């Protein structure tokens, strides 16, 4: 398996910095692991019609890491770190506005 480049968008970095210490460490380790395996067993695909990258989420306790995988470029973009509940992926369209359509 090839190694993926992991990019965390600036807004997601800000969210990571605001997390409680224990959660922040778990989130950072999970993000680093995306370089070797961007589709860990506990991650789930998020259905987004007409979008080129595959959008997934990884659950860590009550937190979600929302990210996009572009296999052609071996790239993982971390888009958001959100607490659930109340997060319901309502801003997913805004997070993905810069990605090309199929």
Task: Locate each region found by the language model.
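Active-site micro-motifs of SAM-dependent methyltransferase domains
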Residues: 14, 33, 83-86
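Residues that recognize and position ribonucleotide moieties
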Residues: 5-6, 56-58, 85
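Enriched for short, Lys/Arg-rich terminal
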Residues: 3, 63, 68-102
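Non-catalytic, surface-exposed connector residues within folded enzymatic/regulatory domains
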Residues: 25-28, 42, 89-90
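A short, surface-exposed loop/turn module that caps and links secondary-structure elements
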Residues: 32-58
């Amino acid at each position: 398996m090839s190694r993926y480049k992991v990019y965390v968008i600036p807004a997601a970095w800000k969210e990571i910095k605001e997390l409680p210490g224990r959660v922040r460490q778990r989130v950072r380790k999970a993000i680093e692991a995306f370089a070797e395996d961007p589709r860990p067993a506990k991650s789930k695909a998020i259905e987004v019609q007409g979008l080129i990258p595959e959008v997934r989420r990884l659950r860590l306790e009550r937190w979600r890491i929302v990210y996009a995988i572009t296999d052609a470029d071996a790239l993982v973009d971390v888009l958001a770190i959100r607490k659930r509940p109340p997060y319901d992926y309502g801003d997913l369209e805004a997070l993905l506005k810069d990605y090309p359509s199929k």
